[in-house]
Swiss-Prot record:
Keywords: 4Fe-4S, Cytoplasm, Iron, Iron-sulfur, Metal-binding, S-adenosyl-L-methionine, Transferase. [4Fe-4S] cluster 2 binds at C97, C101, C104. Its EC number is 2.8.1.8. CDD domains: Radical_SAM (cd01335). This is Lipoyl synthase. Binds 2 [4Fe-4S] clusters per subunit. One cluster is coordinated with 3 cysteines and an exchangeable S-adenosyl-L-methionine. [4Fe-4S] cluster 1 binds at C71, C76, C82, S311. Pathway: Protein modification; protein lipoylation via endogenous pathway; protein N(6)-(lipoyl)lysine from octanoyl-[acyl-carrier-protein]: step 2/2. Its cofactor is [4Fe-4S] cluster. GO terms for molecular function: 4 iron, 4 sulfur cluster binding; lipoate synthase activity; metal ion binding.
Length: 331
């Protein structure tokens, strides 16, 4: 449940501190009211980390190189499985986001200055881990004139120098008000896959994505694709925030109308009681319906299921798309 926030009762805060939970969501236009939690169904299962996997090795390497992963910051339920397999989604430009999306567990606050050594540290870490496929994402950096596009480009360049055979997917923010500049910068160092998530249906944007615009995000994906027609584009949404099945299908249609190639749909799981509540748990049969409809609409790949997240098995998704593209070229 949500209501309008009353600014008169909002306490003071230190903007330089990282705010999470209630401290983060208290200043958004919509106030999150705690609700009784829906019981988790049997099909919601998370794989725990095992000491016999690379889970702790990956964590130690990340800390040693002063790197952050969205897996940790966003409390991803798949962290045990992904770290255990030696994969991670790197989050650049710090751990303080300039937005306050109440579904997300990444902290909000005044961001620190960019770490000029981060591209080098990131590239060295990826090379040391001998990763074949990496996903690089970031917090929103509305404080930067290019929205952080230049830092993305520098990270891509350094990774390519040290690991020329590593494929790079970037999961970018919307570069609000800076799209032209951001796309121009990325043209000089394009990724292998361009990902930007719509997150939810447009009706829920005021509640779930304050500060973002549905059409603007769609346009970002379409414009990148127009400039890089051979580079796969990708987007994802969560279900369980109050959307209807028809709204999910319409978002999928909108993606295809804006030339998005790859799709992810997963179940929203609230990180804490201070975040937006789960309003429904989508049945596996419904996820199957989404997947079938996705391929009918022409998506080259659709990763759809309760535990799917934007970067989950991203290497397998991209491999399927590029293999299909190669088949078309060779025919």
């Amino acid at each position: 449940m949500t209501t309008e926030t009353n600014p008169a009762v909002t306490p003071a805060y230190n903007p330089s501190e990282k705010q999470k939970g209630a401290a983060k969501t208290i200043r958004i236009p919509i106030k999150v009211i705690p609700m009784e939690r829906l019981p988790k169904p049997d099909w919601i299962r998370v794989k725990a980390a095992s000491p016999s996997t690379r889970f702790y090795e990956i964590k130690d390497i990340l800390r040693a190189n002063n790197l952050v992963t969205v897996c940790e910051e966003a409390s991803c339920p798949n962290i045990g499985e992904c770290f255990g397999k030696g994969t991670a989604t790197f989050m650049i430009m710090g751990d303080k986001c300039t937005r306050r999306c109440p579904f997300c567990d990444v902290g909000h606050g005044r961001p620190d200055p960019l770490d000029v050594n981060e591209p080098e540290n990131l590239a060295k870490t990826i090379a040391a881990l001998r990763l074949n496929y990496v996903v690089i994402t970031s917090v929103d950096r509305d404080d930067l004139r290019d929205g952080g596009a230049g830092h993305f480009a520098e990270c891509i360049r350094r990774v390519r120098e040290l690991s020329p055979n590593t494929r790079i997917e970037i999961l970018v923010p919307d570069f609000r008000g800076r799209m032209d500049r951001a796309l121009e910068i990325l043209n000089a160092a394009p990724p292998d896959v361009m990902n930007h998530n719509l997150e939810t249906a447009p009706r829920l944007y005021k509640e779930a994505r304050p500060g973002s615009d549905y059409e603007y995000s769609l346009n970002l994906l379409k414009r990148f694709k127009a400039q890089h027609p051979n580079t796969p584009t990708k987007s994802g949404i969560m279900v369980g925030l109050g959307e209807t099945d028809e709204e999910v299908l319409q978002v999928m249609r909108d993606m295809r109308a804006h030339d998005v190639d790859m799709l992810t749909i997963g179940q929203y799981l609230m990180p804490s009681g201070d975040h937006l509540p789960v309003r429904r748990y989508v049945h596996p049969d419904t996820f199957k319906m989404y997947e079938e409809e996705a391929y009918k609409m022409g998506f080259a790949h659709a990763a759809v299921g309760a535990m799917v997240r934007s970067s989950y098995h991203a290497d397998q998704q991209a491999h399927g798309v590029t293999s299909a593209q190669s088949d078309v070229v060779n025919k």
